[in-house]
Amino acid sequence: MAGHSKWANIKRQKARVDAKKAQVFARLSRAMIVAARQGLPDPAANFQLRTAIEKAKAAGIPNDNIERAIAKGAGTLSGDGRQFESVRYEGYGPSGIAILIEALTDNRNRTAANLRAAFSKQGGNLGETGCVSWMFRQRGVVQLTGAIAEADLLKALLDLPAESYDLDESGAIVYCSIADLEALSTQLRQLGYPVEDSELRWIPNDYQLVTDGEQARSLLRLLDTLETLEDVCSVTANLELPPELVTALEATL
């Protein structure tokens, strides 16, 4: 198992906090809709839905909103004629960085137009289905927070259904198969590890290093824009940035 972190990917996706409460509610509601759509609408039998509900409650989303989101995902919400579907979009950012986007939409044309405009503004382009998805694979991701002793973590993971991990001073990210996510999260909690989040994520097979400051700035602006679009549920890119460039960019973005 290798232990090194790729900035601007998993950690970046989890560390960002939306400034507007409405955006937080919308994003968490979409997560519940997607989870209910992809599995059973019963949280006791659907780990992803149960996790999404826990996040929603922690953010202060009212129970009525949670129930509506689950019903919408299950297709049982009365009085709402909109039909939502999960759609995956793919494209390239500056420097040829591959970007994979998961969206939940009731209007594909609107979503595609918004994505296309965002890509074009920062020098990228929205591509055809399949153009970059082969560069990613879906895995289970468990995020741990706080100081983690690598030797102790590695010893624990040898007896758990983990495939690999990334570790730095702020915590660790442990990867596993889709089927093992619930078991891994539960067992890490039982061992006393501070599990902050557990979810399915698209992970790049390889990362592309970008060292040019302007290209990196355009890429991060593009990712920020994509993440705030109404229909977007998640954004993943095969981007890696040198630590010194990260430090320089943090002061300007």
From Swiss-Prot:
Q: Which domain of life is it from?
A: Bacteria
Write the signal peptide boundaries: none
Q: Which InterPro entries match?
A: Integrase-like_N, TACO1_YebC-like_2nd/3rd_dom, TACO1_YebC_N, Transcrip_reg_TACO1-like, Transcrip_reg_TACO1-like_dom3, YebC-like
Gene Ontology CC annotations of this record: cytosol
An MF annotation (GO) of this entry:
DNA binding
Question: SUPFAM superfamilies this protein is in?
Answer: YebC-like
Q: Quick check: keyword DNA-binding in the entry?
A: yes
What keywords are annotated for this sequence in UniProt? Answer: Cytoplasm, DNA-binding, Transcription, Transcription regulation
Tell me a GO biological process for this protein: regulation of DNA-templated transcription
**Where in the cell?**
Cytoplasm
Statement: the UniProt record of this protein carries the keyword Transmembrane = no
Its family remark reads: Belongs to the TACO1 family.
Mind telling me what this protein is named?
A: Probable transcriptional regulatory protein syc0529_d
Q: What organism is this sequence from?
A: Synechococcus sp. (strain ATCC 27144 / PCC 6301 / SAUG 1402/1) (Anacystis nidulans)
